[in-house]
A protein has these predicted regions:
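Soluble catalytic regions of membrane-associated enzymes that act on cell-envelope
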Residues: 1-242
Length: 242
């Protein structure tokens, strides 16, 4: 009964018609054409056909914290070092505004809708395609690590239905220093590094950070002064970068 009532409450605005605006065919085609790229422009930058793949999902980070993306100077110097040894995509925009929306965008390439989150509709979410399943067909092992509670936003359910081999969250790291939301990032990075050395190859492994989420109770220094309102957030990003 609870699931039925919850579903009705979350979708009641759709009972009165389509809540989305309809664009003309010309507008739609013009938008889609921007994504068309000739195949010969693709460059293969790896030497290994089956490299290990590591995703580090940075909680609440934005271009405002990254100097090369017209952000403030000095907040993320270590990220800047990574830019010099990799590729930085500058024409990239957020797919949503909550963590649960991000998961289905990142792993299932599913767009975010304004009023509903598909991850909370398990019967639909389990039918989504997933990079994890595609890589598994190529012999990949998959894992996901988070220092907080993956029950938030129904993320754990989504990861299970997408058949990740290893899923670990706060309860698996209860011996590590923690704040109100979970294990501090510096300790999770250490654990993650250790776990990577144990995984069967090739693998796809993900770490979702936490310390740059409110209430920003990380154990690092608060030495960056931006403005009173944003100081805690900016310093939390600097902490994760460090």
């Amino acid at each position: 009964n609870w699931n039925l009532l919850q579903s009705i409450f979350k979708n009641k605005r759709n009972f009165y018609g389509n809540p989305y605006k309809k664009h003309s065919d010309l507008e739609i085609n013009t938008f889609i054409d921007e994504f068309k790229v000739e195949n010969q422009s693709t460059k293969f930058i790896l030497k290994n056909n089956k490299p290990n793949i590591v995703f580090i999902l940075l909680e609440s980070w934005s271009a405002d914290n990254i100097e090369s993306l017209n952000g403030l100077n000095g907040i993320t110097p270590n990220f800047k070092n990574l830019e010099n040894n990799g590729l930085l995509f500058s024409n990239f925009f957020s797919n949503g505004w909550t963590s649960d929306q991000a998961m289905t965008s990142i792993f299932s390439s599913f767009p975010v809708f304004p009023y509903v989150s598909i991850i909370n509709q398990t019967d639909k979410a389990r039918k989504l395609p997933c990079i994890n399943k595609s890589l598994r067909e190529e012999g990949y092992h998959s894992s996901y690590y988070f220092g907080g509670q993956l029950t938030y936003g129904n993320i754990k359910s989504y990861l299970y239905t997408q058949e990740f081999n290893i899923i670990k969250d706060e309860k698996d790291f209860n011996n590590l220093p923690s704040g109100k939301l979970g294990v501090h990032d510096e300790y999770m990075f250490d654990v993650f590094h250790s776990e990577l050395n144990k995984l069967p190859e090739p693998f796809m492994s993900t770490l979702f950070t936490l310390s740059s989420h409110s209430p920003f109770d990380f154990p690092g220094e608060h030495k960056i002064s931006f403005n009173h309102r944003e100081d805690e957030y900016v310093n939390s990003v600097a902490y994760t970068d460090k």
